[in-house]
Every structure is written in C-alpha cells, then in structure tokens.
Amino acid sequence: MSDIIAAVSTGRLVSAIGIVRLSGEGCIPLAFSVFTPRGQATAKTVEDRKLILGALHDRQGRIIDEAMLTVSRAPHSYTGEDTAEFHCHGSPAVLSAALEALFAKGARQAGSGEFTKRAFLNGRMDLTQAEAVIDLIEAESAEAAANAAGQLGGAMGKKITPVYDRLTDVLAHFHAELDYPDEDIDPLVLSEVEAAVAHCAGK
C-alpha cells in the first residue's frame, strides 16, 4: 500500500482535543509540509513517539492552529507503516481545514476501519484483534469493554492458534496419504481423528 490515508480519529464534534491521523509511505514529510515546528525537527530527524509543538497550516498556508505532531516509523506503528498524528484543538473547522490541506498535498480520505485493516494486512494484529478494535469502540458497558480489551490483547488468538495448528496437522496427514499412496506413511485411524476434533472442540 503506497498511498497515504488521512482521517479525523476523534470525531468532528467540538472538543478540547482533536486528532488527525495519517498512514502510508511518505506521510511524515507530507505532515511536515503543513506544519512548522518551533524547534529544529525535520521529517528526517524527528524522533518517534515524541510530541513536538508547532504551527498547523491550511491549504493556503495560513496558520490555523498551534498543534502537536508525533510520528511512528514502520514497522513499529499501529498500522505497520509510517504514521503521523496531529493533536490540535478540537474545532470541527480546524480539523476539516487540516484534512483539506493534507488532501491538497496528496493524501486521501481513509475508508471506514482502514487504519485497522492496514494493521491486519501488515501483520500487526490478527483477525480477532482487528474485530476487538470494533467491539471496544462500540462497547456500551465496562464489562463489554473489558472483554474487548482482553481480545485486543490477543487472548482469543492464543486460544485459536493451537486449535488451528492441530487441525492443520490432521488435514496435512490426510493430504499426504491421498497424494502419496505408495509412500510409507502411517495411516490415521478414525479414533485418532475423532480424538483430535473432540480436543479442539473442548477448547
């Protein structure tokens, strides 16, 4: 995935803080093209996961906010790609202007769930963790949030992986018997298959 995506990740309601997120190769220099840091940081020298203060510009180059910028380089980011985030005041007008400036520089609007999709495709999380992100966002109780958080931490994936591995072993043995009937392969007996399936079902 070579394109750069951008989106408001905190919603567009009036709030104290709003976050605009970018992901994709080249997103860090793109972020700096609409941001003037107060210090000496550049797209090449900025440290990962360190907030830097500066001026955020709209597509006409006007300063629209005093904001913070943080970056994470691939593969050590949420999506597994280079990422950047602007932490600015949560004015819908500011957030929209920031996005428009980024789109004018070559970014595109991220699709729904696209950051998490990229994290999954880049191996940063498994499918159960990707689903847990949605569950956590939509949680309506502390219990639901706790369950989703556990799943996000990989609890479900840890249960599924050994089951998948065991069933894959059984299937591979069947394929070997069918594909190489003349080879000296120990045949699986029905009771062993039933035991393996029962063991997995009990998980």
Give the role of each language-model region.
Residues 1-146, 150, 154:
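A glycine-rich (often HGG/GG-containing) alpha/beta subdomain
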Residues 2-12, 54, 144-203:
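C-terminal-of-GTPase-core extension/linker across diverse P-loop GTPases
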